[in-house]
């Protein structure tokens, strides 16, 4: 269910702010979004997997916190990230 190393490296390269960046809010949010999307596909086939649903809720909350942090720190980066990821806000 987790992302493979190649999927992670592609996402990191796409969203990194500078070379070697793996911890910026943009990268973290992009990785969480990919994991969330993968889990949503899992729940289409496994509706009663409540243990994984708890992990999904934790990921969504963590993404929300990171987005709130980014919005307070740099609004333009926040808006660009939301548009690039296709999130609703």
Swiss-Prot record:
One Gene Ontology biological process: translation
Annotated InterPro entries: Ribosomal_uS15, Ribosomal_uS15_bac-type, uS15_NS1_RNA-bd_sf
One example GO MF annotation: rRNA binding
One GO CC term on file: cytosolic small ribosomal subunit
Keywords of this entry: Ribonucleoprotein, Ribosomal protein, RNA-binding, rRNA-binding
Known partners and oligomeric status: Part of the 30S ribosomal subunit. Forms a bridge to the 50S subunit in the 70S ribosome, contacting the 23S rRNA.
Physiological role: One of the primary rRNA binding proteins, it binds directly to 16S rRNA where it helps nucleate assembly of the platform of the 30S subunit by binding and bridging several RNA helices of the 16S rRNA.
UniProt record similarity statement: Belongs to the universal ribosomal protein uS15 family.
Protein name, entry field: Small ribosomal subunit protein uS15
Organism: Hahella chejuensis (strain KCTC 2396)
